[in-house]
Amino acid sequence: MAAEIAEQPQVWRRLLDEGTDAIAAAAARIAERAPRFVLFVARGTSDHAALYAKYLVEITHGLPAGLVSPSTMTVYGARPDLRDVLYIAVSQSGGSPDLVQSVEVARQQGALTPAVTNNAGSALATAAEIHIDALAGAERSVAATKSYTAELLALYLLLERARGGDGRAADALPDLGAQVLASGELVRNVAQRYRFAQRLITTGRGYSYPTAREAALKLMETSYLSAQAFSGADLLHGPLATVDPQVPVLAVVPEGAGGDAMLPVLARLADRNADVFGVGAAPALENLAGGITLPSGVPDTLSSLLEILPLQQLALHLAIARGGDPDKPRGLRKVTETL
């Protein structure tokens, strides 16, 4: 897991250098079809990449977007009318039968079906009308890290090209990612601080909400913590009552609208005397228990790739601090097949 976390800037560079022609061709087909609605289908970590892309579609394309429950097709036999729908599947392995079947049904029902996977030879890549390779390379860690951020970048480039952009804002990411990863020793110290926690909350808004969800999943997978993710808005609608000084809160507070929307949430957490550790913009972290400052000037559409890096490191170091092995989480397999 440690090696694959460290590899991510190289993975992004490879995708930017070698994957953009295929992505541009896929984007051209999407633009030609001019879909009126976008649906995403995914599981696990890839579901968080899909949620990030849902925000991209709704904010930058001005189209309605949603996340599909594959069971509506695979278990209940639903056959929705998907004409004028862009139906994007996201999967590291491309091997889960429910995703494959849902894409097959979506094609039959009239949707354009791109798939983003890290396995060009997978059943999902074959079932989809268009395949985009995330080019993350073999991922051996059960807890996905580099494939997740590669999916984020592939989805950003695809959707940015589909609306006529060039995606050049992503060119700086490899260097910025290396800069963020250099704070690993600070993250190790944070892990020591929280090693006895039994429960933890993660929170963010907008593009950072998927980051909060992915961070919670990584902590559950590797450290066996009961980690709950909430959008900053939803946290205030009830779950705030569960926060006390013994429940650490990991808050993602980047520059931009999403980070600004988190400021009232931080104020309410302070009222609860919460132990809040932040990842994001320097001004927002000043009054917290601690934090990792991210590079400034990064578009909020791309901040998700940088935000998750220290949180992946935290999951790694927290697992080790608690006596576990993050490379061999109990009860989990690299490829999970569901119907």
Language-model features, listed with the residues they occupy:
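Generic C-terminus detector
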Residues: 298-339
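Generic helix-packing signal
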Residues: 13, 54-58, 106, 110, ...
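Conserved phosphate/anionic-ligand binding catalytic regions in large, soluble enzymes, centered on
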Residues: 1, 48-53, 212-221, 308-310
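Active-site phosphate/pyrophosphate-binding segments
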Residues: 3-4, 9, 13-35, 130-248, ...
